UniProtKB/Swiss-Prot annotation:
Keyword terms, alphabetized: Hormone, Secreted
Induction: Produced in the A cells of the islets of Langerhans in response to a drop in blood sugar concentration.
Location(s), subcellular: Secreted
Cellular component GO terms held in the UniProt record: extracellular region
Family indicated by similarity: Belongs to the glucagon family.
Lineage: Eukaryota, Metazoa, Chordata, Craniata, Vertebrata
Purpose: Glucagon plays a key role in glucose metabolism and homeostasis. Regulates blood glucose by increasing gluconeogenesis and decreasing glycolysis.
Disulfide bonds: none
UniProt GO MF annotations: hormone activity
Protein's UniProt name: Glucagon-2
Length: 36
């Protein structure tokens, strides 16, 4: 099932991308002093 493998890899990629964006957002929030 090559389709399953592709979906799996794609999901992993999306998760990594989402995690990266979340980290970036956290850093921005901390810089603004929104997180105390």
């Amino acid at each position: 099932h090559s389709q399953d493998t592709f979906t799996n890899e794609y999901n992993k990629y999306l998760e990594a991308k989402h995690a990266q964006e979340f980290v970036q957002w956290l850093i921005k929030s901390k810089r603004r002093g929104g997180l105390t």
